[in-house]
Amino acid sequence: MYYSSGNYEAFARPKKPEGVDNKSAYIVGSGLAALTAACYLVRDGQMKGERVHILEKGPTAGGACDGWKFENIGYVMRGGREMDNHFEVMWDLFHSIPSIETEGVSVLDEYYWLNKADPNYSLCRATEKRGQDAHTDGKFDLSDKGAMEIMKLFFTPNEDLQDKRITDFFDDEVFHSNFWLYWRTMFAFENWHSALEMKLYIQRYIHHIGGLPDFTALRFTKYNQYESMILPMVKYLEGFGVQFHFGVQVTNVEFDCKSDRKVAKRIDIIENGERGGIDLTENDLVFITNGGCVENSSMGSQNTPAPYNTEIKEGGGWDMWRKIAAQDPAFGHPDKFCYDPEQTNWMSATVETLDQRIIPYITKICKRDPFSGKVVTGGIVTVKDSSWLMSWTINRQPQFRSQPKDHCLVWVYSLFTDKPGDFVKKPMRECTGKEICMEWLYHLGVPVEQIEDMAENSANTVPVMMPYIDAFFMPRAYGDRPKVVPDGAVNFAFLGQFAETPRDTIFTTEYSMRTGMEAVYTRLNIDRGVPEVWGSVYDVRDLLDATVKLRDGKKPIDMELNLVEKMALKKVLGKIEGTDIEKLLKEYHII
């Protein structure tokens, strides 16, 4: 496997890999990484579909990329997906996946046309004082000291960030800024999370710094992530004859491990309550989704809280990974990520409006008609003075094809599930759907005397607790996640957010899909490049642009400097006078 960039590799079709007709594949899990691996097995690996087996413990495919209506409960979207135009692997695959809505076009075509015709941007990024605009006004509001703290992290070598927390690099100069309000609510970072991952995020999206305050950097699918992404992939795979095995719990993968050679020998399973297994040869390839951000997630209802279940049990991704990791140090250290759910949990809730009473309060804040079929909030609206640090968003409606035309679906999430609310004086994790809706309505500015009635009769709210949703953000060191293909691996690879691949950032669709592509390309030795992570961090234009925009348009040369620094700067500017360097610095408002 090798990385590439540019159209030469992107548009090429690889030859059929040698020996592929003698191989079979077993994929543990059916999330985005797993489905991506399956797609590349049949598309570029040209493996026969009937030789590809997807083992899924649940009743449907998709993993964390869900979207479902549960009978007698309501619509549920555990999360949402924010996409980037430089998700190189994602678009490499989705240009081949046919739309299930429009004949003759791809998922990428649909997505591209939609976001060109209806570009995303927010008209209100944050509120305070019960629905009033917090007037962040597109500003990061960073002091010179805060900007320098970010700069220091940006240039710190990865090796020096092992097991470090964000609090080791930032103080209140950053934490009290709009920058941190935007950042942690958009990406679900907490102050105690990994400094390494924080650095990787800044570098990965340096080309989008200017688009973070108003979300012009983002793009979204037409419907929820399940209907817009997962279903087309499933239909594509079914067309090749790929075998989906639902209700199959993988409890372990057994290996024969030597210092220089590691072979997967058996997959241990539970199916229909019976223990069994799949014996493997070296021609049987195993792709393992280890860990899981939505493991142990639980659902409540309008009148019941979502249980907070933290016990790791057999048959789930964490227990399986623990058993795998016990067999060889190269298979990672799962307990670095799942040891303390108090540091990794947050909650979401899906609110379905049932009439028009709530809509005017939404419209007042987002300044758009929620039923226009176009962008509504344009990303999350964060309630700046919320004790739960609540954010909410409304994507283009409808979010489900089955959704009533006069109903609006709102996604609400909060990072602090253990804090009492501002209206409902209970922690979010103890609240029913109705009570979470009441807290949200309070922050919309609904008159207090109308809140309970609206939450009960004008909305149906379904809460979801996810104890390990931020597990991948926990401080880590190299080796804590197994490489996608560990050294010496003969017939297996790891997939998903807890597999190690360089430069990319977790909690993204691209990361999952990248691990799937890299795993298949390595195991089948496919002779075509995997698109490298977009290299904006190496583009001086993006670096200069981000430097100015992070400081809200202020030139770096206007920072407070001592006499020696001023003299040095004057000398440097004199040296570049009349050169292309001077022109470039002026173009990007550095000088």
Please give the residue ranges for each predicted region.
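Glycine- and aromatic-enriched mobile tails/lids
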Residues: 118-122, 421, 480-482, 498-510, ...
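Rossmann-like flavin
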Residues: 100-207, 219-220
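Amphipathic alpha-helical segments that form well-ordered structural scaffolds
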Residues: 89-96, 182, 228-239, 435-443, ...
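Extreme N-terminal leader/targeting segments of oxidoreductases
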Residues: 1-25, 43-51, 69, 550-558, ...
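C-terminal segments that line or cap access tunnels to active or ligand-binding sites in enzymes
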Residues: 207-221, 283-285, 290-515, 521-538
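Helical element adjacent to the flavin cofactor pocket in flavoenzyme catalytic cores
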Residues: 203-285, 290-291, 303-304, 309-318
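N-terminal glycine-rich phosphate/pyrophosphate-binding loop and immediately adjacent elements
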Residues: 13, 19-149
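Beta1-alpha1 glycine-rich phosphate/pyrophosphate-binding loop at the start
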Residues: 1-3, 37, 41, 45-85, ...
